[in-house]
């Protein structure tokens, strides 16, 4: 993974911790926890790959899992360690690159989260290598949740978040396809790759995983940030119900292909 990605997360460790508390991202967080509870084994050893400041590591530790957090950012790992200490929880912390999962023993983990690296690795061969190594460190029939950024969802979100793009028709139409942004191509983010549902499925299946299901993390509420912010202020109970129901229905096919984040639930071969 590039130094640009590492620097971004070193510089934005606290922001990344807070991100999952914002009005829109609470749905992403709830959907991921829904998938963990639905598909992960009830106990075992879990690797949170690219898990940043440890929001999911905390939830895994709370549920009694033996959790390992791997992240490229030393600042994120420091923050995760302090947060778990405050809560009296334990986990293993490793500063490392998702491109080098072969540092772990084969068949070590019962399940894994791969929630960020696949949209920060530009080269398709490098992404394939990550998936192959992920498959290797999982036990037979091990479960993983793999996240991608989705152009098909971002075309809707962009109406609010980056409307200046839409002054050029070519940029608008480009959001129907895979996109890469190297270096500082995105002024308020870092180097990243945006996939499509079709491309992500092909990439995962090429690596030999069985796709059990996939979800749109934002569900039916994808792209609706201003309305969600308004609802959370004017009717907090209704907003809470939206978060819960969007998470519970995140696998419905009529929504999942048009959300910012795609979460694939996969199984390693026997």
Where are these regions (language model features)?
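Class I SAM-dependent methyltransferase SAM/SAH-binding core
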Residues: 55-100
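Short alpha-helix
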Residues: 191-208, 214
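C-terminal lobe and adjacent flexible extensions of AdoMet/dcAdoMet transferase-like proteins
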Residues: 207-270
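A short glycine-rich, Lys/Arg-flanked "PGG" loop and its adjoining helix->strand segment in the class I
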Residues: 128-140
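A short acidic, Gly/Pro-enriched loop at the edge of an enzyme's catalytic core
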Residues: 103-112
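Conserved class I S-adenosyl-L-methionine
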Residues: 1-52, 55, 59, 144-174
């Amino acid at each position: 993974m590039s130094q640009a990605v590492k620097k971004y997360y070193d510089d934005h460790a606290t922001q990344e911790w807070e991100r999952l508390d914002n009005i829109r991202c609470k749905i992403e967080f709830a959907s991921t926890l829904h998938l963990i509870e639905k598909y992960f084994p009830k106990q075992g050893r879990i690797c949170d790959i690219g898990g940043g400041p440890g929001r999911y590591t905390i939830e895994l530790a709370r549920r009694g899992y033996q959790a390992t957090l791997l992240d490229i950012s030393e600042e994120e790992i420091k923050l995760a360690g302090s947060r778990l200490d405050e809560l009296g929880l334990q986990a293993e912390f490793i500063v490392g690159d998702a491109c080098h999962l072969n540092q772990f023993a084969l068949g070590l983990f019962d399940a894994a989260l791969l929630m960020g690296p696949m949209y920060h690795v530009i080269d398709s061969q490098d992404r394939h290598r990550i998936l192959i190594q992920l498959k290797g460190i999982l036990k037979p029939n091990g479960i993983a949740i793999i996240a991608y950024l989705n152009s098909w969802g971002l075309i809707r979100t962009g109406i609010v978040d980056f409307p200046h793009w839409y002054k050029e028709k070519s940029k608008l139409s480009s959001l129907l396809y895979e996109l890469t942004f190297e270096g500082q191509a995105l002024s308020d983010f870092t180097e990243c790759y945006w996939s499509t549902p079709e491309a992500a499925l092909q990439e995962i299946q090429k690596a030999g995983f069985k796709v059990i299901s996939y979800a749109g993390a934002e569900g039916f509420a994808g792209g609706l940030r201003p309305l969600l912010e308004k609802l959370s202020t004017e009717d907090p109970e209704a907003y809470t119900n939206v978060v819960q129901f969007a998470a519970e229905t995140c696998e419905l096919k009529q929504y999942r292909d048009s959300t910012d984040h795609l979460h694939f639930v996969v199984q390693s071969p026997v």
